[in-house]
Amino acid sequence: MAHKKAGGSTRNGRDSNPKYLGVKRYGGELVKAGTIIIRQRGTKTHPGVNVGCGKDHTLFALKDGTVKFHTGGALNRKFVSIEE
């Protein structure tokens, strides 16, 4: 009689989809209003002048202009702004 024992189970059979996070427009680039500048988890970089923050912490341009990255504030945080 041909028999085959049951194969053992593995705990590694999962893989999540890529999230495509990161900087989408770099310093000095011209952007239009609504352009996504950074996709991130949490406020690693904070919104500055003319930059909005979505509910998933995506930073986007509120006006047309040039992207500028800088640090500042009491806690020396990273900011991104749009200069018109």
From Swiss-Prot:
The keyword Cell division does not apply. The keyword Transmembrane helix does not apply. Residues 1-21 are annotated as: Disordered. It comes from the Bacteria. Keywords: Ribonucleoprotein, Ribosomal protein. One of its GO terms (biological process) is translation. PROSITE patterns: RIBOSOMAL_L27 (PS00831). GO terms for cellular component: cytosolic large ribosomal subunit. Belongs to the bacterial ribosomal protein bL27 family. This is Large ribosomal subunit protein bL27. It comes from Francisella tularensis subsp. holarctica (strain LVS). The gene is rpmA.
